[in-house]
């Protein structure tokens, strides 16, 4: 199976290729379009370089969208989905709900899978937590994210937290209160019977869920987990998670709006 990749600025192109190398043989990243980072081309000689995203899609069995700029994902996902090519949309899935909704709806309409977001959500540990989440009145999720990052502000790393929140707790939140002080972002996400507190700082730290105890989440083995998930989605053994990601983008929008007040 040949996976095409669009986007080469982030390290995820290499991370995902390394992840595929750890899985049973039979799939690899072939064509790559690096329109977002042409300066990376000299280091990409082990891939088949394409000049356009359309060329990548045509010569691939499925597509990885690896752009840091989430607002570019929807148009590219549309091209792939209309050609019947399953899509993995890297984080951030989108930067507004309308674009996220469009990808989810087109996936449903075409019957072509669309999935993606933070690969931490696909680790066995998170699957186990989803299946047997301790019952608490309050939870806290913490991870690193810089609201002033040159890589798309809080969208790029903050989407880990919104993806994890909607993965673990669903999209049924009814209110969000967010604030930023000294680059520390905190958001209170209110559900009918409990609340989830999201907290990020720019410094390097592992992702942690605080519930009945502290759960250290895996942000290293997550790349193979993400690719294993995508391959299962391509084969239609596992459903994509585009609907959940719409909820994540909705949560992201609410947090960003709160930070602007």
Where are these predicted regions, by residue range?
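N-terminal Rossmann-like dinucleotide-binding module
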Residues: 1-44, 134, 244, 248, ...
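Short beta->alpha connector loops
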Residues: 9-11, 68-71, 93-94, 120-122, ...
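Beta-loop-alpha module in the N-terminal Rossmann-like domain of NAD(P)-dependent dehydrogenases
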Residues: 27, 45-88, 92-104
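Conserved acidic residues
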Residues: 32, 61, 137
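C-terminal helix-rich "cap/oligomerization" subdomain common to oxidoreductases
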Residues: 42, 55, 59-67, 233-261
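A contiguous active-site-proximal alpha/beta segment in oxidoreductase catalytic domains
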Residues: 94-148
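Rossmann-like dinucleotide-binding domain that binds NAD(P)(H)
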Residues: 141-203, 243-250
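C-terminal substrate-binding/catalytic lobe of Rossmann-fold NAD(P)-dependent oxidoreductases
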Residues: 182-230
């Amino acid at each position: 199976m040949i996976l095409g990749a669009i986007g080469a600025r982030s390290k995820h192109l290499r991370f995902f290729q390394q992840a595929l190398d750890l899985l049973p043989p039979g799939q690899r990243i072939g064509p790559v379009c690096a329109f977002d980072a042409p300066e990376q081309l000299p280091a990409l000689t082990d891939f088949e370089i394409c000049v356009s995203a359309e060329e990548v899609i045509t010569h691939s069995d499925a597509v990885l969208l690896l752009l840091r700029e989430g607002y570019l994902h929807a148009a590219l996902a549309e091209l792939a989905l209309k050609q019947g090519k399953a899509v993995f949309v890297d984080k951030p899935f989108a930067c507004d709900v309308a674009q996220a909704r469009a990808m989810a709806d087109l996936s449903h309409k075409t019957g072509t899978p669309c999935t993606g977001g933070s690969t931490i959500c696909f680790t066995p540990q998170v699957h186990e937590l989803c299946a047997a989440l301790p019952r608490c009145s309050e939870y806290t999720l913490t991870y690193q994210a810089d609201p002033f990052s040159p890589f798309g502000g809080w969208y790029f790393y903050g989407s880990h937290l919104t993806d994890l929140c909607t993965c673990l707790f669903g999209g049924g939140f009814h209110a969000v209160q967010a604030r930023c002080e000294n680059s520390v972002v905190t958001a209170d996400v209110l559900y009918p019977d409990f609340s989830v507190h999201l907290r990020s700082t720019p410094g390097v730290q592992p992702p942690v869920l605080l519930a009945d105890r502290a759960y250290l989440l895996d942000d290293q083995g997550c790349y193979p987990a993400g690719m294993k998930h995508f391959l299962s989605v391509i084969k239609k053994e596992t459903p994509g998670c585009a609907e959940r990601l719409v909820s994540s983008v909705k949560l992201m929008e609410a947090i960003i709006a709160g930070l602007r007040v």
